[in-house]
Design a protein with these regions (language model features):
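Glycine-rich beta-strand-centered segment in the early N-terminal region that forms part
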Residues: 1-23, 38, 50
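Short, flexible surface segments
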Residues: 7-13, 75, 98, 205
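Adenosine-nucleotide cofactor-binding segment
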Residues: 98-101, 105-108, 116-195
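Residue-level detector of alpha-helix initiation sites
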Residues: 63, 74, 108-111, 193-194
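NAD(P)H dinucleotide-binding glycine-rich loop of Rossmann-like/cofactor-binding domains
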Residues: 20-100
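C-terminal hydrophobic helical "lid"/dimerization subdomain
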Residues: 87, 166-171, 194-201, 205, ...
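Generic structural signal for buried aliphatic residues
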Residues: 14-18, 102, 209
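Glycine-rich phosphate-binding loop and adjacent beta-alpha segment
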Residues: 143-153, 190-256, 293-295
């Protein structure tokens, strides 16, 4: 909560707040660029440059954790809005295709599950969402937190599939799409060459593939079908981060229970666990780690 405020009338003590770390026009972030704001601080002072650009706002949700994972969820939202399709050859229609087929490759991690949750909430809902992984345990957990029955109630056919058990991944995945010819929107949630190439191969006509997972190798590349790019209007792009509007949308949808940010979280800890968790993060399996800064 906000503990105290200055003479301005925009904020009031006691309000829940959310904060966008990607400040427009600067590289510095409230993560670790400020001396009195960010990091693992129990209390902090928000400087003017964060407030004046609209990166601090209040929300009416009934929990605190939902705003704490608003940044990764806003990245997911940005990904959906970055995809586009073409109408009448020249008009770009932004967003995923309504009533189409979405494939979320490597989608049983925290970000992928956030993408599944968002697909069930958007106004231009797809008809089918196919989520892939190569780990049965992760696929089982994914179905526990976002079940195929829940998706059906929201008008979407959701299928979890282990591609490691497929003899012909391309053809078997295409067969799961609405018309059996491929996917209108493909999201690649792991920076693996083979997965990216698979995503390119399962695109339908006018399909759009989003390399959502950010590679750390600056020479990361993959073979793509440029014939399909020319004759079948396929598109490949990438998205990273999100903007203020994306984060506000996440906060609002979470408050209305339209999306489930909790699906991203697998570990919960207190302030005393911050140091060890941060130092050993690469060795801790699972999804997001929610660490409370309260005493």
């Amino acid at each position: 909560n906000l503990e105290s405020v200055g003479p301005a009338n925009k904020f009031k003590p006691g309000q829940k707040f959310a904060q966008q770390p990607a400040i427009p026009g600067q590289a510095e972030s409230p993560g670790y660029s400020y001396t009195q704001c960010g990091g693992a601080a129990t209390y902090c002072i928000f400087p003017n440059d964060i407030i004046e650009v609209g990166c601090l706002w209040t929300h009416d949700g009934d929990s605190y954790f939902e705003s704490s994972v608003a940044e990764p969820m806003c990245c997911v939202i940005c990904g959906y809005k970055t995809n586009y399709h073409v109408k009448d050859r020249y008009e770009h229609v932004m967003g995923t295709k309504k009533g189409g087929s979405i494939a979320i490759l490597g989608g049983c991690g925290p970000m992928g599950l956030g993408a599944v949750s968002y697909a069930l909430a958007i106004e231009n809902k797809p008809a089918k969402v196919i989520v892939t992984d190569i780990d049965d345990a992760k696929l089982e957990r994914a179905n526990q937190v976002i079940s195929v029955e829940e998706a059906k109630e929201k008008g979407v056919e959701l299928i979890y599939v282990n591609t490691a058990k497929m003899n012909n991944q391309v053809e078997e995945l295409k067969a799961l799409s609405v018309d059996g010819k491929g996917f209108d929107d493909v999201f690649v949630y792991v920076p693996v060459r083979g997965v990216a190439e698979l995503g390119n191969k399962i695109l339908a006509y006018d399909g759009c593939m989003n390399l959502f997972a950010g590679p750390t190798d600056s020479k990361f590349s993959a073979d793509v079908n440029l014939y399909d790019c020319h004759y079948n209007a396929t598109k490949i792009l990438g998205s990273t981060g999100g903007n203020i509007d994306d984060m506000k949308e996440d906060i609002d949808r979470a408050a209305r229970k339209e999306i489930k940010p909790a699906v991203m979280i697998t570990h919960v800890g207190g302030i005393d666990s911050i140091v060890d968790t941060t130092k050993n993060l690469p060795d801790i399996p699972g999804g997001k780690k929610l660490l409370s800064l309260a005493y």
